[in-house]
């Protein structure tokens, strides 16, 4: 598939020359036409022509972002002051083996707990649904995402690939079973309430539990059933349901509301069952 004004290299071959129909949607490698796309109608005041009040609401949340870095800075200053006060009163071994790790852990915990509290204060328990771009909910949702990246992402990155990370993510709203192993990328989750992981899963993928289409945010659950394995850099779109003990190969894409059968291996963009 070639886009308008694109460049074709010398000695290349086009197998078939067919014009796309206006308004059609395509995806995949090789690309295929999507049979239909869910279109959500929303008032233009919430999508393209916001009122002055809605513009003011968005500006307030955008300006508030400038205050977010102050929290980790203050925590860092407190960390330095506490350790400076303890250094002269403890032996070198006590300072390095006890005081330093304990104060560092406490500082990281403050940032994570503050982010958890902000999540429940700003958006509470999120349900599947739709939210227009200029709604107050979208502004608060986006503000939380930025705050998580500045406050909790770095401390939680040290827990990626361990059995401790699921315990923290449950406090954010994730539903995670026992012995779940979550790899890189789960230190900063966009939609924690949408993630449903069963027992014994192994996941190192992008959970795309929302999309913005026509300036409307659509959000829904992503299910990974017991014993399933999701490879590195795979993408699961909202509504995806991975069957028990199934395997999704790295760099694959599971489409919206697609259900993968249990005990089956999948790969591709979009995913297809692997023969044998």
Model regions: which residues?
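Terminal amphipathic alpha-helical/low-complexity segments used for targeting or macromolecular assembly
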Residues: 24-173, 261-276
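Conserved short histidine dyad/triad with adjacent acidic residue
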Residues: 158-163, 181-184, 210-211
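Alpha-helix N-cap/loop-to-helix boundary motif
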Residues: 157-160, 172, 193, 199, ...
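Active-site-adjacent structural elements in folded domains
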Residues: 166-167, 188, 212-217
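Glycine-rich hexapeptide-repeat left-handed beta-helix
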Residues: 1-68, 195-196, 202-276
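Soluble catalytic regions of membrane-associated enzymes that act on cell-envelope
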Residues: 181, 186-187, 193, 200-202
